[in-house]
């Protein structure tokens, strides 16, 4: 067997089982940039940007449907990603529909048509009826 190079002879094996991920140079500089110097040379911490999610709404719906059931963080992240994806698809389709008819405003009609195009059959019908109900409730000002 050939001898190991001198540079790796004294090092421990490269096991990553219990190690945290190694930060790259870009990540190190990004983490350092969170601190900016103030007027007196003191260091100020930047506020964390808030990540907007649908998790509180998903949780409320879960408790309405199954009051005794919980949800893991991973499942919540998947559902949040799903909601973002569906909303993005509907918005993109509604934008295309508005541009086809040379309109600069997306109305409830474009949203409804987008839902019909994106969601399959019965799911689209239920989504449209619930959406219409919500818009009517909002317009009337009732809780």
From Swiss-Prot:
GO terms for cellular component: nucleosome; nucleus. The keyword Nucleus applies. The modification N6-acetyllysine is found at residues 11, 19. The modification Phosphoserine is found at residue 15. It is found in: Nucleus; Chromosome. There is a cross-link at residue 11 (Glycyl lysine isopeptide (Lys-Gly) (interchain with G-Cter in SUMO)). There is a cross-link at residue 137 (Glycyl lysine isopeptide (Lys-Gly) (interchain with G-Cter in ubiquitin)). InterPro entries: Histone-fold, Histone_H2A/H2B/H3, Histone_H2B, HISTONE_H2B_site. GO terms for molecular function: DNA binding; protein heterodimerization activity; structural constituent of chromatin. Residues 23-39 have a biased composition (Low complexity). Keywords: Acetylation, Chromosome, DNA-binding, Isopeptide bond, Nucleosome core, Nucleus, Phosphoprotein, Ubl conjugation. It comes from the Eukaryota. PROSITE patterns: HISTONE_H2B. Residues 1-52 are annotated as: Disordered. Belongs to the histone H2B family. PANTHER family: HISTONE H2B. The nucleosome is a histone octamer containing two molecules each of H2A, H2B, H3 and H4 assembled in one H3-H4 heterotetramer and two H2A-H2B heterodimers. The octamer wraps approximately 147 bp of DNA. This is Histone H2B. The lineage of its organism: Eukaryota, Fungi, Dikarya, Basidiomycota, Agaricomycotina. The gene is htbA.
């Amino acid at each position: 067997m050939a001898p190991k190079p001198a540079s790796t002879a004294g090092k421990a094996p490269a096991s990553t089982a219990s190690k945290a991920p190694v930060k790259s140079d870009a990540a190190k500089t990004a983490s350092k940039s969170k601190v900016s110097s103030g007027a007196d040379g003191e260091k100020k911490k930047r506020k964390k940007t808030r990540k907007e999610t649908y998790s509180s709404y998903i949780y409320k719906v879960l408790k309405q449907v199954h009051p005794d059931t919980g949800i893991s963080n991973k499942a919540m992240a998947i559902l949040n990603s799903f909601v973002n994806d569906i909303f993005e698809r509907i918005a993109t389709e509604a934008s295309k529909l508005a541009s086809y008819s040379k309109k600069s405003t997306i109305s409830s009609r474009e949203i409804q048509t987008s839902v019909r195009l994106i969601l399959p059959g019965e799911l689209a019908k239920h989504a449209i009826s619930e959406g219409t109900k919500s818009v009517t409730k909002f317009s009337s000002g009732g809780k």
